[in-house]
Swiss-Prot record:
Transmembrane segments: none annotated. It holds the Pfam family HARE-HTH. Belongs to the RpoE family. Residues 14-81 form the HTH HARE-type domain. The keyword Transcription applies. Residues 119-150, 162-176, 186-196 have a biased composition (Acidic residues). This is Probable DNA-directed RNA polymerase subunit delta. Signal peptide: none annotated. Participates in both the initiation and recycling phases of transcription. In the presence of the delta subunit, RNAP displays an increased specificity of transcription, a decreased affinity for nucleic acids, and an increased efficiency of RNA synthesis because of enhanced recycling. Gene3D superfamilies: RNA polymerase, subunit delta, N-terminal domain. Residues 151-161 have a biased composition (Basic and acidic residues).
Length: 196
């Protein structure tokens, strides 16, 4: 296939997106992505490996470039062929034809706030009082009894502390070696030093 626009151009300098645009423009009809890629490969004379390496970037460029449009099923065309208002209609019309061939399933409407009789496990009934709430009310009376036991334990502990002898044990005193080296200062001694 010869492209008139690129007669004098060096094929090595052409991008795949430019060639794709010209192929679609010259043919005047939509093409599948695989067929379009094969046409580009033949025109540019590139190997399968070279095309495979550039394929992801080419597909990205097709999507990003505003002059191409995907018509579904990986079929591509030029956006200029479709008036702006008819683009949505053409796409929606294609979906409508498929819908006519197979009947649609009717979906059951679900209201999340209404309880379904068969699914009582999933529904939370906020009107019923929980048995745990009743248990809490009854436990307040029992806590008063616990306070009496706690105060008894406190009294026993205090008594045990009083029984401990606070007297000085001979073992607690240090040998005269360390205590003898310590000096006690009285306020009078400190006042004398400040006057000097």
């Amino acid at each position: 296939m010869e492209l008139e626009k690129f007669k004098d151009a060096n094929k090595d300098e052409l991008s795949m997106i430019e060639v794709a645009h010209e192929i679609l423009h010259q043919r005047g009809e939509t093409m599948a992505f695989a067929d379009l890629t094969n046409e580009i490969q033949v025109y540019l004379g590139k190997s399968d490996e070279e095309i495979r390496d550039r394929l992801a970037q080419f597909y990205t460029d097709l999507n990003i470039d505003g002059s191409f449009i995907s018509l579904g099923d990986n079929v591509w065309g030029l956006r200029s062929w479709y008036p702006y208002d008819s683009i949505d209609e053409a796409l929606v019309h294609g979906e409508d034809e498929e819908d006519e061939e197979r009947p649609r399933k009717k979906r059951k409407k679900v209201n999340a706030f209404l309880a379904d009789v068969s699914d009582d496990d999933d529904v939370i009934d906020y009107d019923d009082d929980d048995p745990e709430d009743e248990d809490l009310d009854n436990d307040y009376d029992d806590e008063d009894d616990d306070d009496d036991e706690g105060s008894h334990e406190l009294k026993q502990y205090t008594k045990d502390l009083d029984d401990i002898d606070d007297g000085d044990d001979p073992e607690d005193e240090l040998a005269d070696g360390i205590e003898g080296q310590l000096t006690e200062f009285s306020d009078a001694d400190l006042d004398e030093e400040n006057q000097d």
